[in-house]
A protein has these predicted regions:
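Acidic, glycine-rich catalytic/binding loops that coordinate metals and/or anionic ligands
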Residues: 349-351, 397, 401, 408, ...
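Primarily a LysM-type cell-wall glycan-binding module
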Residues: 31, 35-56, 81-116, 136-138, ...
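Short glycine/threonine/proline-enriched tight-turn/helix- or strand-capping micro-motif at secondary-structure
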Residues: 343-346, 362-409
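Non-catalytic cell-wall polysaccharide-engagement segments
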Residues: 20-26, 37-42, 243-364, 369, ...
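Extracellular LysM carbohydrate-binding repeats and other cell-envelope/extracellular binding modules
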Residues: 19-28, 35-37, 68-99, 108, ...
Length: 539
């Protein structure tokens, strides 16, 4: 059996760098737009009280390597009061009556509420391993005895992910109409050359599957790039306020912000994130009743600001939510048109292994991040969403050598994107990546790649696996699913099944296996024999 001669120590880098985090090679001078500056709104979100709010905690949070990119000022007399955390004083309080939200699953809910799964009761059947239908009433013992964030939802899930709400939004037109700094901004990226600000925002939204409105809202709130001018020299180079020279420039600043939001959004979905750790050394538990979108916003700002400043930033009347509403209108009404993200009884459509029968491939990566390079020295020991797996064609050479083997369509659909190493196939055929099931084939070579607009049937040729798109040290296919704009975890309540093979996650990223009956294929970065898989003629 042929193997892939790739050094294990470097193979682990193959997909963790799939986000194609570009280098900033230079930023040209940007002309100052004519006319009055459109910002600020009737309040200054950066004028906050820096006095630390101390809450009791028995845990000493780890040091977060980030600096504040602002100068705190005193609080004006008429400053709105801080949103105070809620607190459950004892174990003898009434149980929570919690209505399940879209994307909820029992293990994650149990983790958020510090309860055992067996303690959670409902009239619905909770023995199933599927997602819980939205609106299902759950009775949960009150085990939360720490201060928590406010139980105030400030951002719907549909406004965080690249959902249906993003279909009719024109980034370029909106930015041009605002006539702020971003409308005239350009930067040089190693992966694309010169790119305009709006084009960079749009590409980041599509590739990271994040709502472009949210990207603009964050950029405006932290630096005023969208409707006016940067608030100071620091925010010109570090518009998201993350003061680290490795992240100098708009695109890499936004990549940092989007990665943090994804860590929180999908960590909340999975039940692996329950606390916020602030740069001032304080820690706060996340209220278990919040939705993933709200947690994503709370988490991002907790990485940038002290707890007292954060409390004012998340204030729905005077903080970031107010700025966002001023920019984009009623977010909840817009989200209602896209909800629920995951409808009841959702199942994956039938998928085939994404390569031709009787050809030798290897499972070189178990479940890992769908998109994004998450360096633990920057982001901590966290992960976003383990939605992707890797297949590599068997080869005698390894590295980025071309392959003659074909990646094939796992299901019929419309090719809605074919660029930068990515082929995205829309299975419902409506032409929108933001709706229904979508399958991502990543690292597809430009030569022989199926063009955008093509309808493919199952088994039709997509292209050849390669190292194109992102950072890769070996020819392979990075394969992932999305539904309604949200990455779907590979080993979760909607299992990733191809030709009867089910994906099972390992203890760490890239570990795992495929299981079909009594057959097992174990992921191995160098393609050893236990990772070999050959699709049968009748599969």
């Amino acid at each position: 059996m042929q193997r892939i001669p790739i050094i294990p120590s470097i193979m682990a880098l193959i997909i963790s760098a799939c986000a194609s985090t570009p280098s900033i090679w230079g930023v040209p001078e940007t002309p100052t737009p004519n006319g009055a500056i459109l910002y600020p709104p009737p309040y200054d979100p950066f004028t906050v009280n820096d006095s630390q709010i101390i809450f009791p905690t028995s845990t000493t949070p780890p040091e977060i390597a980030t600096q504040l990119a602002y100068t705190p000022t005193s609080t004006p007399v008429d400053m709105p009061p801080l949103i105070q955390p809620t607190f459950t004083p004892s174990l003898d309080t009434a149980p929570f009556l919690y209505y399940a939200q879209s994307g909820d699953m029992l293990p994650a809910i149990a983790s958020r509420f510090s309860a055992d799964e067996s303690e959670i009761t409902s009239d619905a059947d909770l023995t199933k391993t599927t997602l819980i239908d939205p609106g299902t009433l759950l009775v949960i013992p009150n085990r939360v005895t720490e201060p928590t964030t406010p139980n105030v939802q400030i951002m719907p899930d549909a406004e965080v992910i690249f959902s249906k709400t993003a279909i009719d939004f024109d980034v370029g037109k909106y930015v041009k109409d605002q006539n702020g700094y971003l409308s005239h901004f350009r930067e040089y990226l190693g992966s694309t050359g010169w790119v305009t600000g709006p084009d960079a925002v749009e590409r980041l939204a599509i590739e990271n599957s994040i709502n472009p409105r949210l990207i603009l809202g964050l950029l405006e709130y932290e630096s005023r790039w969208v409707r006016g001018q940067p608030i100071d020299a620091l925010h010109t180079d570090y518009p998201m306020g993350f003061n680290d020279y490795h992240f100098k420039g708009m695109s890499v600043q936004l990549v940092w912000a989007l990665n943090n939001m994804s860590i929180a959004y999908y960590g909340w979905r999975a039940g692996t994130l329950n606390y916020l750790d602030f740069p001032d050394g304080t820690r706060l538990r996340i209220d278990p009743r919040l939705n993933a979108g709200t947690v994503a916003i709370q988490y991002l700002f907790s990485r940038l600001h002290s707890q007292s400043q954060w409390s004012q930033i998340i204030n729905p009347d005077t903080g970031f939510p107010a700025v966002y509403k001023q920019m984009f209108g009623d977010i909840w009404a817009r989200a209602d048109a896209a909800n629920p993200i995951f409808p009841p009884a959702l199942n994956q459509p039938t998928l085939l292994l994404p390569f031709e029968p009787n050809t030798a491939w290897n499972l070189t990566g178990g479940p890992h991040n769908a998109w994004g390079q998450l360096n633990p020295e920057i982001y901590g020991v966290s992960h976003s969403v383990y939605a992707a797996i890797d297949f590599a064609p068997s080869t005698d050479h390894g590295g980025c050598d071309p392959t003659t083997l074909w990646v094939t369509a796992a299901a019929p659909g419309l090719v809605v994107r074919a660029e930068n190493g990515v082929v995205m196939v829309d299975l419902d055929g409506d032409g929108y990546e933001q709706t229904g099931w979508d399958i991502m084939y990543m690292h597809i070579a430009a030569i022989g790649r199926v063009p955008k607009g093509t309808w493919v049937e199952a088994n039709d040729r997509i292209g050849h696996a390669s190292c194109e798109g992102g950072v890769s040290t070996g020819t392979h296919l990075h394969f992932a699913r999305k539904y309604n704009g949200e990455w779907v975890t590979a080993d979760g309540p909607i299992p990733f099944i191809m030709s009867g093979w089910r994906v099972v996650a390992g203890a760490k990223a890239y570990e795992g296996k495929l299981v079909r009956g009594d057959e097992t294929v174990i992921a191995d970065p160098v393609g050893q024999k236990w990772s070999n898989i050959i699709r049968g003629e009748d599969e």
